Structures are given as C-alpha cells and as structure tokens.
Amino acid sequence: MGKRMTARHSVFALLSFLLALTSSPAEAEMYVAGQVGLNLPHSLSNVEDRRGGVTFDENDQSLKSSVMYGAKLGYYFESLKWLGVETEVFKTTPYLTQQHVTTLGGINFLNAPGAHLSVLTWAPANIVVRHQMGAFEPYAGIGLGFNSSRLSVGRGTSKGGGPGLNTQLGLRYRITTNLAVFGEWKFNHANLEYTDFIFKGRDLSVNYNAHNVVFGVGYHF
C-alpha cells in the first residue's frame, strides 16, 4: 500500500512539473545541468531490525563517503525572475563498513559484514530562489525527495526506499548568457525501508542523512 501511494505521489509530482513547464511563458528561463561531487553521509541512524514479530533497535552504523552524480532540469519564471522550480535526480553509493552491532537492549551481535548501499534520489519539484548579481547567482532550494535503494550483503541484495527531504545552497557563475558553472552544497534525508532483508520475514528500517558537495555545468535557454 505504501509503495503504491509513493508511486502515485511520484507520478502526480512529475505531471505537475511538466504541466508547469508547458504552461509557462515562452520567455521563461529554462536550464539543464549535470552535476558530480562527493557524498559525505552520516552514520545510518534509528536502525530497526524486525524479525519474527520482534523489533531490535540497533546502534548507528557507519558509512564511508562516495562519488555523487546526477542531473537537473528547471526554469525560472519570467514574471518572478528570482523564483523557479527544478527537478533533479542523483545517485550515491556509500559503503557500509564492517562493524560491531549491538541493540539498545544490550544484546551483542557478531561483527556485521560490510555492505554496498546505493541510493537513487529523485526530487520532482524543488522550489528554488536566486539573487542575480551580474555574472554571479547565489541560490537555494528545497523539496521532497523519493528514494530508491539497494543494500547488498555478500551475495544477497535487498531493494527498498522511501520518502525524504532534499535541500540545496549554491553559487552559479555565468560564463556566457547560456553557459554556467556552479558549486553546491546539498543535504539529503531519507527513511529507507527494506522488506525481506537477507532472508524472508526480516525487515530493516534506517534513517539516511548525507551532505553532498557538488560541482556542475549548466546550459540556460
């Protein structure tokens, strides 16, 4: 049921964004951009391991940094040049290090093996604001995110995902009227749920929080 609702919200957000694009004035400033950078995740928090009707609250689990890459598409309104809307997608692949796992109840598990985590984030409609200062444009944005994730331990892979929050703060520099480069700090929060994690009947829930320092190139129409 939750996955169906998330899918419906995703489709609705995409349709709303496309409708806004098609109904905007022809003079509206549109842009596309590519971005790449460094993902700096916090430890996974609020870790809940559920099996056999019992929930184990586990300690936070460390993640290593990774490369982040993605793309943006958006536009600024002609009547409100400081206000715009943007959709973006980006992927990170932080590594879950091998570490000792305990529960808040004091139960000690063996060392958990390392795991490969990938998180694909789609922010369908970030609201963005900017301040035009000649060639320089500081900007900020915020929006909901939808996250699709894979967690691989040994030969087993579990798929999951969940909603989240996406924020950004950056500085754009116009090389020409159409070509721009930018640097950006981005924060991503997500609650990730994995069903039948490693084996059937075991579910895992975690909070994923990460800073991203990115650079990119954009083309403005």
Residue ranges and their predicted role:
Residues 2-13:
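Bacterial N-terminal signal peptides that target proteins for export
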Residues 29, 40, 72-154, 173, ...:
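Gram-negative (and chloroplast) outer-membrane scaffold detector with strong preference
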Residues 44-53, 97-104, 149-158, 193-200:
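Outer-membrane beta-barrel translocator domains and adjoining extracellular loop/strand segments
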